[in-house]
Design a protein with these regions (language model features):
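Structural signature of hydrophobic alpha-helical transmembrane segments
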Residues: 20-22, 41-51, 76-81, 109, ...
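Entry/N-cap segments of selected transmembrane alpha helices
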Residues: 14-25, 78, 141-145, 200-205
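Alpha-helical transmembrane segments of multipass membrane proteins
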Residues: 29-34, 60-61, 120, 153, ...
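Membrane-embedded alpha-helical modules
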Residues: 131-217
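Helix-loop-helix junctions within the multi-pass membrane cores of secondary transporters/permeases
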Residues: 6, 76-164
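Membrane-interface helix caps of multi-pass small-molecule transporters
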Residues: 50, 63, 91, 95, ...
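Alpha-helical transmembrane segments and their membrane-interface exit regions
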Residues: 54-57, 80-87, 176-181, 202-203, ...
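Helix-loop-helix hairpins and the membrane-proximal interhelical loops
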Residues: 1-52, 63-76
Length: 232
């Protein structure tokens, strides 16, 4: 079973000063309004966030729906966008693994992988006994997931009062927050180098391939930072 003490400790961590709760909520208010505007009802909007729970994936799903893409194409588009979460999963799960914990917890908790929850866990895992980290992580994930769902409902109900510019402003709050958090995480050579090179190479590749510039810049920046760190 899930240890309630560590679960609620993780759940309450979303109230911290560095919590992404406000930024995450603002972005999903925009998602809720967008889903209503493209024809979703309230139940469908909630179910969408319940399953997708990632801002880029939700945006891609909505955009694909608008242009009339088939269900399989929407599924593939969201799957490809959310593939970016795989490296985060690979880097996080070894920190949570403990032989006393059942495997179903780890399979369940993979759904909570998102930049918001991942940043909270990476900042706090050392203060939690390894045996209980998975319960702490499930608490974090449940908290951020709940915020996303509640914000989607608020956005859906407030859609008539939000114009296009307001929705864009709300949607961009979360990426800005993550950018600030990444700068704050520059505590090692590898992390600092990857962020700085990414900020330089991303725009540089835009002139070569606008569609793939972020991917190319990120892969190259991360690879260089990794090998520089290994050489050190």
């Amino acid at each position: 079973m899930i240890n309630s003490k560590y679960f609620f400790k993780g759940f309450k961590s979303i109230k911290g000063i560095n919590s992404p709760a406000l930024a995450l909520g603002a972005s999903f208010i925009a998602i809720g309004a967008l889903l209503k505007n493209i024809g979703f009802n309230l139940e469908q909007s909630i179910f969408s966030t319940f399953l997708t729970y990632a801002l880029p994936g939700s945006l891609v799903m909505a955009e694909s729906f608008i242009v009339g893409a088939s269900l399989i194409n929407i599924f593939l588009a969201v799957w490809l966008v959310n593939a970016r979460l795989y490296p985060m999963t690979v880097s996080l799960m070894p920190l949570l693994l403990h032989k006393s914990q059942p495997r179903w917890k780890y399979y369940l908790s993979c759904h909570f992988i998102a930049v918001s929850a991942w940043l909270i866990m990476k900042s706090n895992y050392q203060s939690i006994e390894k045996k209980h980290r998975i319960d702490f992580w499930i608490g974090i994930g449940t908290g951020t997931w709940s915020i996303a769902i509640i914000a989607t409902v608020i956005g859906f109900l407030a859609a008539d009062y939000l114009n296009k510019d307001m929705m864009i402003g709300l949607a961009i709050v979360n990426p800005v927050y993550f950018g600030c958090m990444m700068v704050g995480a520059m505590k090692s050579l590898q992390i600092s180098l990857s962020i700085i090179l990414g900020a330089i190479l991303g725009p540089a590749f835009f002139f070569i391939s606008p569609e793939w510039s972020i991917l190319y810049g990120g892969v190259l920046a991360g690879t260089i930072a990794y090998f520089v760190g290994e050489l050190k």
